[in-house]
Amino acid sequence: MSMSDPLGDMLTRIRNALARKKGKVVTPASKLRARVLDVLQSEGYIRGYNQVDLGDGKSEIEIELKYFEGLAAIREISRVSKPGRRVYVSAKSIPHVANGLGISILSTPKGVMADYEARKQNVGGELLCRVF
């Protein structure tokens, strides 16, 4: 059975693992997932991730979640643009998350990046998710 929203699946796995206070979570690998995880790691929301080759052309990503004094670094993570309803924004209309305390992750012609980077480079794109 094919998965209709691979990125949404990864975000749900992260959300569920954080609710159960897990240290790591495993998800199937893809380039988009890896780029989103790069942004999450650079912003300090996860400790890191590594890609594990399973052979036969398949691989998984093992994500190390981050906690501080028993609380998850990610309070809320949600998908914005979905397969049935894509959400595109211009550089001037990129929303602020929690008055600037959180970030939006966008897929732009210049790559996957956080909202403030897209504003700085004056580029819009598909609004993938919000993290707070």
UniProtKB/Swiss-Prot annotation:
Question: One short Pfam family name for this protein?
Answer: Ribosomal_S8
Q: GO annotations under biological process?
A: translation
Q: Which GO terms describe its cellular component?
A: ribonucleoprotein complex; ribosome
Matching entries from InterPro entries are given as:
Ribosomal_uS8, Ribosomal_uS8_CS, Ribosomal_uS8_sf
Signal sequence coordinates: none
Query: Could you list the residue ranges forming a coiled coil in this record?
Result: none
Disulfide pairings = none
Name the Gene Ontology molecular function terms of this record.
Answer: rRNA binding; structural constituent of ribosome
- In terms of domain of life, where is this protein from? Bacteria
Q: Which UniProt keywords apply?
A: Ribonucleoprotein, Ribosomal protein, RNA-binding, rRNA-binding
What the record says about family reads:
Belongs to the universal ribosomal protein uS8 family.
- Annotated function: One of the primary rRNA binding proteins, it binds directly to 16S rRNA central domain where it helps coordinate assembly of the platform of the 30S subunit.
Q: How does it assemble?
A: Part of the 30S ribosomal subunit. Contacts proteins S5 and S12.
In Swiss-Prot or TrEMBL terms, this protein is called Small ribosomal subunit protein uS8
Organism listed in the record: Bartonella henselae (strain ATCC 49882 / DSM 28221 / CCUG 30454 / Houston 1)
Q: State the gene name recorded for this protein.
A: rpsH
